[in-house]
């Protein structure tokens, strides 16, 4: 194990673990899939060598909670039953000489919608109770279906861990700690690792045969320079040029608008609290001024003075709502915005490539 003073620099995930996460997430989609990660910490690099899913918790059919199955699946990593299950699994892995150090957990996401209270509580549980040097792997099923694997690693920042432990997300505390929504997560780079034997095998796989007949090469030089002769299974293909714009981009825009509406709702609630607080403070100030005038009169008449702190019993100041939900929602808005920006930048070149076919009356240059 590496020294704890050395910070984590990257997360290295075995290809087999990636395939397990993809398979589990795809099978349970759109329900949230969660599981445990095991591996080791080697000189600041967290090596994930194995993974296993958490069992599905059965929810009574007459449950009165909305979205109870989804909530139970998202909260599975910190459930007591799954904690016992995880301990037993790690014990069995140790018996067969497999890396049995808990290094975190994984979860699936849809359209980047993973910044919520469940992932915060799960990761806080892992970093506080199990191992401080643990990560949360987030696999976006919808984003990966567009042709590029979406697998990201996150940890809670020490600054947010301290604030979440106190559970005081008021405006005053946030200003004192200088905690912003950008400081919630610390993202680590993810590296996919293959053994040398597997890499050699992939490069030796034969390419698929061409669909049409090919002319025989006239010479040895022509055969050597033929791109089909040197191509392999790992060569980029034309599938990356597909224009799959509408499903992903439209859904992201809809979810971005929903998050912005939620932000306005949270903002209105906080403004209502400020107005209520101002009204109560005005009443308290008027009461205190009246009590001081009464005490001045009683002092002239040499009568006992009345208590001036009695307003604490007569008036009750409204409690400030927690700013945690607002911070998480703002972080989610940033997540959607980055996704839309990245997707649009990747498709802009494709759109220019087919511009002549999309706009009638224009000819290609």
Swiss-Prot record:
Entry's transmembrane regions: none
GO process annotations (BP): formation of cytoplasmic translation initiation complex
Compartment list: Cytoplasm
InterPro entries: eIF3h (IPR027524), eIF3h_C (IPR045810), JAMM/MPN+_dom (IPR000555), JAMM_MPN+_peptidase_M67A (IPR050242), MPN (IPR037518)
Classification via PROSITE patterns: MPN
GO molecular function: metallopeptidase activity; translation initiation factor activity
Gene3D superfamilies reported for this sequence: Cytidine Deaminase, domain 2
One GO CC term, this protein: eukaryotic 48S preinitiation complex
Coiled-coil segments on the chain, per record: 273-303
Keywords from the UniProt entry: Coiled coil, Cytoplasm, Initiation factor, Protein biosynthesis
Subunit structure, as described in the record: Component of the eukaryotic translation initiation factor 3 (eIF-3) complex.
Recorded family membership: Belongs to the eIF-3 subunit H family.
HAMAP family in alphabetical order: eIF3h
Protein name per UniProt: Eukaryotic translation initiation factor 3 subunit H
Species of provenance: Coccidioides immitis (strain RS)
Source species taxonomy: Eukaryota, Fungi, Dikarya, Ascomycota, Pezizomycotina
């Amino acid at each position: 194990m590496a020294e704890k003073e050395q910070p984590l620099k990257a997360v290295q995930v075995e290809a087999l673990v990636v395939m397990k996460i993809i398979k589990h997430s795809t099978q349970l989609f759109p329900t949230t899939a969660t599981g445990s990660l095991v591996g080791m910490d080697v000189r600041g690099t967290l090596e994930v060598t194995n993974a296993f899913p958490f069992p599905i918790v059965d929810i009574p059919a007459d449950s009165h909670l909305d979205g109870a199955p989804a909530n139970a699946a998202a909260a599975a990593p910190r459930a007591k039953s799954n904690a016992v299950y995880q301990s037993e699994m790690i014990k069995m892995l140790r018996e067969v000489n497999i890396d049995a150090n808990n290094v975190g957990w994984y979860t699936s996401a849809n359209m980047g919608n993973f910044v919520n209270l469940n992932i915060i509580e799960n990761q806080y549980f892992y970093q506080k109770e199990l191992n401080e040097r643990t990560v949360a792997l987030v696999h976006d099923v919808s984003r990966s279906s567009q042709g590029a694997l979406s697998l990201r690693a996150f940890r809670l920042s020490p600054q947010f861990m301290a604030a979440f432990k106190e559970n005081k997300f008021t405006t005053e505390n946030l200003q004192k700690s200088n905690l912003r929504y950008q400081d919630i997560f610390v993202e680590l780079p993810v590296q996919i690792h293959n053994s040398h034997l597997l890499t050699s095998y992939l490069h030796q796989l034969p390419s698929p045969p061409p669909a049409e007949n090919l002319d025989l090469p006239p010479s040895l030089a022509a055969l050597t320079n033929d791109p089909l002769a040197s191509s392999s299974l790992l060569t980029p293909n034309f599938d990356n040029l597909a224009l799959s714009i509408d499903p992903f981009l439209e859904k992201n825009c809809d979810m971005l608008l929903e998050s912005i509406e939620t932000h306005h709702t949270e903002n209105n609630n906080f403004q209502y609290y400020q107005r209520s607080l101002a009204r109560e403070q005005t009443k308290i100030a008027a009461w205190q001024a009246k009590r001081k005038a009464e005490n001045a009169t009683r002092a002239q008449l040499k009568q006992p003075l009345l208590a001036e702190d009695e307003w604490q019993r007569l008036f009750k100041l409204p409690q400030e709502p927690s700013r945690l939900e607002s911070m998480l929602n703002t972080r989610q808005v940033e997540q959607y915005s980055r996704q839309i920006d990245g997707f649009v930048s990747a498709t802009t070149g494709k759109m220019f490539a087919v511009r002549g076919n999309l706009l009638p009356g224009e000819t290609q240059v």
